[in-house]
Amino acid sequence: MKRELCLCLGVAALLASGCSTEVSYGDAKETETVTVDYGSTDLQSLSGKMVQSLIDSPATTEISVNGRPVLFVDSIRNKSSEHIDTEALTDTMRTQLLRSGKFRFVDMSKVAAVKEQLEYQQTSGQVDPASMVRLGKQTGAQYMLYGNLASIVKDNGKVKDVFYQLTMNLMDLRSGELVWADQQEIRKQSKKKTLGW
């Protein structure tokens, strides 16, 4: 009995080790089509097209006449049916726009941390006054970039169709006017295969 149990456990261990997962690196720019859900290819495509649209816009030429305008990027609202990390989309767009050399940015997501550090420098008595950052010297944003990511999903059991739409806006903070807006769209489809004998 013990011998049979040991033999069964040995066979089970051998089978379990044969089902191990292989991990490998892939090209981050390669098209990813594992599912119709939002993925890395969608992030790269939407952000790349949107950034190029803003860079090529006559509005960008107009607001850049007196130098690189200062922007802050508000969070992109996820209005899709999926849990999507819109912060990754926001970060990617901000990075690409900054690399373009056409814009400067302030990071509103870190205001509380910056304020805490400045207060520490001013009030703690621990910071050398010669190296202390003075209050009231930060650059203010002139424009706000913000948007929404929405989706429409249709599924009839055989075909699943997913449509994504990213809408972005650039607002002049002085006047409240929209100086630029664009939409980029992606449609993905999956079909269930039927067995053919």
Q: Model features per residue range: what roles?
A:
Residues 49-54, 70-75, 126-155:
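A short, hydrophobic beta-strand-centered structural micro-motif
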Residues 125, 192-197:
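Short, surface-exposed secondary-structure junctions/capping segments
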Residues 25-60:
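N-terminal leader/capping segments at the start of a protein or of a new domain
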Residues 13-37, 196-197:
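Bacterial Sec signal peptide processing site at the extreme N-terminus
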Residues 1-19:
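Sec-dependent bacterial lipoprotein signal peptides
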Residues 20-23, 143-190, 194:
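Amphipathic beta-strand/beta-sheet edge segments enriched in Tyr/Trp
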